Amino acid sequence: MKTTIKQAKDHLNQDVTIGAWLTNKRSSGKIAFLQLRDGTGFMQGVVVKSEVDEEVFKLAKEITQESSLYVTGTITEDNRSDLGYEMQVKSIEVISEAHDYPITPKNHGTEFLMDHRHLWLRSKKQHAVMKIRNEVIRATYEFFNKDGFTKVDPPILTASAPEGTSELFHTKYFDQDAFLSQSGQLYLEAAAMAHGKVFSFGPTFRAEKSKTRRHLIEFWMIEGEMAFTNHAESLEIQEQYVTHVVKSVLENCKLELKILERDTSKLEKVATPFPRISYDDAIEFLKAEGFDDIEWGEDFGAPHETAIANHYDLPVFITNYPTKIKPFYMQPNPENEETVLCADLIAPEGYGEIIGGSERVDDLELLEQRVKEHGLDEEAYSYYLDLRRYGSVPHCGFGLGLERTVAWISGVEHVRETAPFPRLLNRLYP
């Protein structure tokens, strides 16, 4: 019977065949231990010399790392294993032998591993991170579908940008200029006027020359837009969404979190409502904490965000930033028109902003004024202005960066490990 490592638990004390790769092995004179993986998990295969043909034991000692195999044997309980079971191997068939696999079981530098990312993905920890990424995506669809959102796919090639063009990748679109999208927001706002609540999930591109552990050039973003929704209601949806994702990973990725040695007690504390602190109060807090490199009207850097989030030891909303440091489409704060109705959700443990969101300007005259103030081409944004001409309503939206969120939940140091093939400032290969 052919099965997988994950499904093997349903076949205790039965003989099965599993297609797998050999990740590592060790042997003595009478027994060989094979570390096997098949994409669904990692399992140990035990080959006892006295219980198999001589050729099988000889093969078990000689097969090379990352060779592909069909392994047949009996699934038995093993309480020492993370899985709780292993295979007593009876026969081995080599599908393809690997020669001189470059990522041997020893320490390698980051650049070497990134050069071999196509192979590094096979390692146990990288496999665990990708499984957590997958669960975050699954839980995202689950949340939005249950809450009545419609999925909309905005274009990746655009003629205009939500936040100006300084950080956009330019390309030619036949005889026109085009840019790789840095957000689907403007299109989602249009879709929200048709469907009420919409979300998207897709790649975004930022031509930022950043080399921090938080930044990728290409990353995936989950964006939501909601009609007839105010800023406070939007924050509630955001915190419910993040809480749902964290709980789903805790429930469905226990083994992966264990492999990554993640301190799950920090994630177990994540619950609604999240703390909220205004930009004004955050500036005062930082001053009291000894930060003398930040003044009102300046954006926060990584050390500032980390200090604020670590104070709460939870995700925290920083609300109502100054108008002058935020994009043109954000609604003024009626209590202080030098600020806007927006919030950044900052993850604890130094992972930084994972969500940016705001209430959108819904008044045509104000939006036209903002477009001019920001030096944007009114013609390029005519479709966006139309949304305010024909039945404008209060509406809000937000975007969550997938890779940064996965980094926080999984506890990995650098965001590059949360994308299968990350695009960094100096890396376009593989």
Curated annotation (Swiss-Prot):
Presence of the UniProt keyword Iron in the record: no
Keyword Transcription regulation in annotation: no
EC number(s) on file: 6.1.1.22
Entry-linked CDD domains: AsnRS_cyto_like_N, AsxRS_core
Pfam family, one: tRNA_anti-codon
GO cellular component: cytoplasm
HAMAP family with a match to the protein in the record: Asn_tRNA_synth (MF_00534)
Gene: asnS
GO terms of biological process kind: asparaginyl-tRNA aminoacylation
Source organism of this protein record: Staphylococcus aureus (strain NCTC 8325 / PS 47)
Name assigned to this protein: Asparagine--tRNA ligase
Compartments reported by the entry: Cytoplasm
Subunit structure: Homodimer.
Family the UniProt entry places it in: Belongs to the class-II aminoacyl-tRNA synthetase family.
Gene3D superfamilies in the record: Bira Bifunctional Protein, Domain 2, Nucleic acid-binding proteins
Catalysed transformations (reactions): tRNA(Asn) + L-asparagine + ATP = L-asparaginyl-tRNA(Asn) + AMP + diphosphate + H(+)
Keyword set, alphabetical order: Aminoacyl-tRNA synthetase, ATP-binding, Cytoplasm, Ligase, Nucleotide-binding, Protein biosynthesis
GO molecular function annotation: asparagine-tRNA ligase activity; ATP binding; catalytic activity, acting on a protein; nucleic acid binding; transferase activity
InterPro entries with a match to the protein in the record: Aa-tRNA-synt_II, aa-tRNA-synth_II, aa-tRNA-synth_II/BPL/LPL, Asn-tRNA-ligase, Asp/Asn-tRNA-synth_IIb, NA-bd_OB-fold, NA-bd_OB_tRNA
